[in-house]
C-alpha cells in the first residue's frame, strides 16, 4: 500500500510542478482531482502511512529562480471540491454544524479558470504583484501585472477612504475573444499557438520581458481581500466584492447571495446552462459563507478553508480503465474498434463505450486492454480517449491486434496498403452490411426495383425474409407473409413482385454496379463490363488485369479482386444468377466513337437531365468527369455555368451548348428517350 501511495505522491508532485511552476499543465483539472482524491482516500484509510511530503498538506510547487521569491504574509490556500448535489449538501451540513443556531448565507461566484495572484497596494498605489506559487511562496511579477489594462494601478473612490495597506486576491485570465485573436496572430507569424486560455494567460504573465505581457489581452478579476489596514469595516463577502468595484477593480460578471444551499444548487444549474455564452472560461462556481465573522469561526484545514468550496461542473475528462476492445462492423463494412470502459461520469453523462476509430489510432495511443485512460467529453462532443497512462499499466495488459476475419460473418478482413480503415470483404453476405447492401442493390441506377424502399426493407428484415440481396428474388414465395405487413395490400404486394421480376433483365454494367463493390461507381462498372464482357471473366481477373481497365487504380483493383475472392460473395452471386438475373450476351466489340474521351457537364441543363446526357455519352464510350483538366475533351455548358467554364476557357478546352450537343448525339444515333 505504501508503494501505491508513494507512486501517487510522485505523480502528483510531477503534475504540481508542471501546473504551478512551469504553467504548462500536463493533465486536466479533473484528472488531477482524481489522483489527489485517490491519495487522500488511502491516507484516510491508512493514517499511519501518511508521508511527510504528501501533497494533501500543500498547494503546489517551488518558485522558479528567474523571478524574485516572495513569502505570502497570508498563505494563498486552494479550495476543496464538491462534484454533485450530495457533496454540496454535505459541505453545507458541516458548515452549519459548526455554526449552530446561526443563519448562514452563501456567496456564489464563477470559478474562473486563470492564474491566481495577489496584489499589494500602499496608500492606493500598486507596489507588488505575486503569483500563488506553492501557497507559501510566490514569484514577484509586478512589472507584468502593471501592463494589464483593467487592473487599477492607483485606487480611486468617491465613496470610501483608500486604505493605507490593501492586499487583493484574484485571477488573471484571457477572455475567449482575446485568446482566439492571439492564437490567430501567433499562427500568422508561424509561432506556436496556445492550447487554451489559461495556458495563454499564464505564459504571458510569466514572461521576463513585460512588453510581451503588455501585448497580450490579459484581464484581472478580483475575488477577495487578504489584508486591509485600517480594517474596511465590511461584514460580508458580498459587500466586500461590491467595495472592490468602488475602488476600481473588476469582478466576475455573476455573483449571487443565496439564503439556502438549495438556492445555491439552483444557481449552479443556471450557471452551467449559461456557461457557453460567458466571455471567460470557467470550470464551476465557488461557494463561500458570506458572513466574514462566520468565516473566522469556521477557520481552516491544512490546505483549504472550511468556509468555502469549489463546486465543479461535470468533469470534461476523467480516468477509467479499458475492460475490453471489441470490433464493430458498419454498414459499409468498415471495422471500428470500440473500447468498453469501466463506466465513468464525464461531461454530464456516464460513459462506458468509446470509439477508437481504427487500428492506426490504437497504435498511436498504444492503448491496451487493462490500461488506465483519460476520457474527454465536453458539450455534445462524442467522448474520446485522449491519453493512456502507461505508469498504471498492469502486467497482464493485452496488446490489441486487427482481426483477420470479420466478427460478424467470418469473411476475411482486408486493409489495402496506405488505407487507414480495415473492412470486411463479405459485402453481399455480411449481416452488418445488409441494409446498406440492399438499399444500394435496389436503387434506380442499379437493379432499379421500384417500390422496394426503406420501409419495405426494414419490415422484411424484421420478418427475417431478407438475409442478403439474393433473397429479394424469392420474396414471391412469401406472398401471404407480405400481405400481413401493415399498410401492404394486394396491389402493393403485386406491384413489388412485378418490379422484382422486371429487374431480372438488366445489363452487365448495372449488375456490377449493384454489387456495391468498394470504389466501383457507375463509370467504373461500365468500364469493367466493356473490358471483361462476361461476369465469369471479371470474377477470374487478377489485380494486374483489373489495373489495365480504364478508371481502375491500384487500390480499386485490390478491392475488386478481394470481393470476388470472398467465398460468401460468390455464393450470393451464384444464387442471383440462379434466380434468373440475366443480360444480353456481348456482341463483338466495336470501337465506340468517343471511346476513352473525358467530357464535363456544367451549369443548368434545360432540354435534358444530367443523367440523360451522361447516359448518351457513356453509350458512345466517353467518361463523364466532375472537373475540368487538360485531359478534358469537351465541356457541355448549360445556363449559369461557373468556374468550370472559366477553367475550360483558360485551358483552351472546346465548349458546346445543349443544342449543339444534342445534334452531335443525334448524329451518333443517341436521342432523348
UniProtKB/Swiss-Prot annotation:
Q: What class of enzyme is it?
A: ligase
Superkingdom field: Bacteria
Reported EC number(s) for this entry are 6.5.1.2
What is any Pfam family matched here? DNA_ligase_aden
Q: Matching PROSITE patterns, A to Z?
A: BRCT, DNA_LIGASE_N1, DNA_LIGASE_N2
Q: Which cofactor does it need?
A: Mg(2+); Mn(2+)
Residues spanning the signal sequence: none
Span of domain BRCT: 589-673
Key words, A-Z? DNA damage, DNA repair, DNA replication, Ligase, Magnesium, Manganese, Metal-binding, NAD, Zinc
Which residues hold NAD(+)? 29-33, 78-79, 109, 132, 171, 288, 312
Query: Record's GO cellular component, any one?
Result: cytosol
Query: Which species is listed as the source?
Result: Acinetobacter baumannii (strain ACICU)
The UniProt catalytic activity note for this protein reads: NAD(+) + (deoxyribonucleotide)n-3'-hydroxyl + 5'-phospho-(deoxyribonucleotide)m = (deoxyribonucleotide)n+m + AMP + beta-nicotinamide D-nucleotide
- From the Swiss-Prot or TrEMBL record, give the protein name: DNA ligase
Q: What does this protein do?
A: DNA ligase that catalyzes the formation of phosphodiester linkages between 5'-phosphoryl and 3'-hydroxyl groups in double-stranded DNA using NAD as a coenzyme and as the energy source for the reaction. It is essential for DNA replication and repair of damaged DNA.
Family of the protein in this entry: Belongs to the NAD-dependent DNA ligase family. LigA subfamily.
Annotated GO molecular function terms are: DNA binding; DNA ligase (NAD+) activity; metal ion binding
In its UniProt record, which GO terms are filed under biological process? DNA repair; DNA replication
What does the entry list as the binding residues for Zn(2+)? 406, 409, 424, 430
Amino acid at each position: 500500500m505504501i508503494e501505491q501511495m508513494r507512486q501517487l505522491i510522485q505523480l502528483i508532485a510531477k503534475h504540481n510542478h508542471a501546473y504551478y511552476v512551469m504553467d504548462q499543465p500536463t493533465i486536466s483539472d479533473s484528472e488531477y482531482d482524481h489522483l489527489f482524491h485517490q491519495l487522500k482516500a488511502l491516507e484516510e484509510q491508512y493514517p499511519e502511512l501518511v508521508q511527510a511530503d504528501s501533497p494533501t498538506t500543500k498547494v503546489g510547487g517551488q518558485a522558479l529562480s528567474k523571478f524574485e521569491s516572495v513569502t505570502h504574509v497570508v498563505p494563498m490556500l486552494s479550495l476543496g471540491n464538491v462534484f454533485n448535489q450530495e457533496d454540496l449538501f454535505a459541505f453545507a451540513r458541516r458548515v452549519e454544524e459548526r455554526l449552530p443556531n446561526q443563519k448562514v448565507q452563501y456567496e456564489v461566484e464563477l470559478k474562473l479558470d486563470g492564474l491566481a495572484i495577489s496584489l499589494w497596494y500602499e496608500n492606493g498605489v500598486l507596489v507588488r504583484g505575486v503569483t500563488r506559487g506553492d501557497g507559501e511562496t510566490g514569484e514577484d511579477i509586478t512589472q507584468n501585472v502593471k501592463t494589464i489594462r483593467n487592473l487599477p494601478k492607483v485606487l480611486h473612490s468617491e465613496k470610501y477612504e483608500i486604505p493605507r495597506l490593501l492586499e487583493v486576491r484574484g485571477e488573471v485570465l484571457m477572455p475567449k475573444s482575446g485568446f482566439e485573436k492571439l492564437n490567430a496572430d501567433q499562427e500568422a507569424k508561424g509561432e506556436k499557438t496556445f492550447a487554451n486560455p489559461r495556458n495563454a494567460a499564464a505564459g504571458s504573465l510569466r514572461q521576463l520581458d513585460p512588453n510581451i505581457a503588455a501585448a497580450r489581452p490579459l484581464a484581472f478579476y478580483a475575488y477577495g481581500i487578504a489584508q486591509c489596514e485600517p480594517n474596511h469595516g465590511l461584514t460580508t463577502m458580498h459587500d466586500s466584492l461590491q467595495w472592490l468595484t468602488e475602488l476600481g477593480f473588476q469582478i466576475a460578471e455573476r455573483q449571487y447571495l443565496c439564503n439556502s444551499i438549495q438556492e445555491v444548487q439552483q444557481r449552479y444549474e443556471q450557471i452551467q446552462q449559461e456557461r457557453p455564452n460567458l466571455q471567460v472560461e470557467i470550470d464551476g462556481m465557488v461557494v463561500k459563507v458570506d458572513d466574514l465573522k462566520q468565516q473566522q469561526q469556521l477557520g481552516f484545514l491544512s490546505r483549504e478553508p472550511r468556509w468555502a468550496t469549489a463546486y465543479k461542473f461535470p468533469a470534461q475528462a476523467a480516468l477509467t480503465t479499458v475492460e475490453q476492445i471489441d470490433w464493430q462492423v458498419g454498414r459499409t463494412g468498415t471495422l471500428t474498434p470500440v473500447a468498453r470502459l469501466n463506466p465513468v461520469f464525464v461531461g454530464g453523462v456516464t460513459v462506458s463505450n468509446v470509439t477508437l476509430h481504427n487500428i492506426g489510432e490504437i497504435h498511436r495511443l498504444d492503448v491496451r486492454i487493462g490500461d488506465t485512460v483519460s476520457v474527454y467529453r465536453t458539450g455534445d462532443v462524442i467522448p474520446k480517449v485522449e491519453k493512456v497512462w502507461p505508469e498504471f499499466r498492469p502486467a497482464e495488459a493485452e496488446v490489441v491486434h486487427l482481426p483477420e476475419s470479420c466478427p460478424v460473418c467470418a469473411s476475411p478482413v482486408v486493409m489495402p496498403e496506405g488505407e487507414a480503415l480495415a473492412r470486411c470483404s463479405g459485402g453481399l453476405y455480411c449481416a452488418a452490411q445488409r441494409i446498406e447492401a440492399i438499399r444500394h442493390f435496389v436503387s434506380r441506377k442499379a437493379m432499379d426495383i421500384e417500390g422496394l424502399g426503406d420501409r419495405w426493407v426494414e419490415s422484411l428484415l424484421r420478418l427475417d425474409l431478407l438475409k442478403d440481396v439474393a433473397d429479394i428474388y424469392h420474396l414471391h414465395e412469401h406472398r401471404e407473409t407480405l400481405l400481413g405487413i401493415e399498410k401492404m395490400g394486394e396491389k402493393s404486394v403485386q406491384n413489388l413482385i412485378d418490379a422484382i421480376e422486371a429487374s431480372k433483365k438488366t445489363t452487365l454494367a448495372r449488375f456490377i454496379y449493384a454489387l456495391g463493390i468498394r470504389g466501383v461507381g457507375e463509370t467504373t462498372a461500365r468500364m469493367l463490363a466493356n473490358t471483361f464482357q462476361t461476369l465469369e471473366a471479371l470474377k477470374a481477373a487478377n489485380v494486374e488485369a483489373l489495373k489495365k481497365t480504364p478508371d481502375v487504380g491500384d487500390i480499386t483493383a485490390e478491392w475488386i479482386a478481394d470481393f470476388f475472392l470472398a467465398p460468401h460473395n460468390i455464393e450470393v452471386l451464384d444464387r442471383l444468377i440462379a434466380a434468373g438475373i440475366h443480360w444480353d450476351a456481348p456482341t463483338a466489340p466495336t470501337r465506340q466513337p468517343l471511346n476513352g474521351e473525358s467530357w464535363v457537364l456544367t451549369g443548368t441543363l434545360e432540354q435534358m437531365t444530367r443523367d440523360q446526357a451522361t447516359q448518351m455519352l457513356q453509350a458512345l464510350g466517353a467518361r463523364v468527369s466532375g472537373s475540368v483538366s487538360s485531359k478534358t475533351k469537351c465541356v457541355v455548358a448549360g445556363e449559369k455555368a461557373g468556374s468550370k467554364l472559366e477553367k475550360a476557357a483558360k485551358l483552351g478546352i472546346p465548349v458546346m451548348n445543349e443544342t449543339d450537343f444534342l445534334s452531335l448525339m443525334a448524329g451518333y444515333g443517341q436521342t432523348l428517350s
